[in-house]
């Protein structure tokens, strides 16, 4: 909870080498969801708004989320589960400067933490790992079976909001601009 009494999200985010999806499916207690996330036009209150469709072909959940940064790795997060009709209505407010992000999220319990690995449809090389924490001082336990490239918690180019502008990680943009396109 933030000082204002609003719900607070505290997390660390890492750029990782894209793991093998089949390997992730074999991890006990792992869960896979498909996610489509669309950013909406800004309002005056400074909150980033988005809608999300999450689930599998058998069951979908729709959410409307508002986030605002308040400190290192900390954001106010207001999230509501909404009916599909409201989701479709809010999609009409999509920010045309951003593309919808499609990803597979693999949630894995690991050493009393929940790992959230996002595998994006636009990248065959990279993925992200997010770990929500009770407070910013809580130590993070990173699994040895993931190739961690960098802590990108406060790096703008790695937020889902930024990724939705280019549908590429900063490293991929640099490779393309540099003519390497590896």
Question: Where is each model-derived feature located?
Answer:
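Phosphate-end processing signature that detects enzymes handling 5′-triphosphorylated RNA
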Residues: 1-182
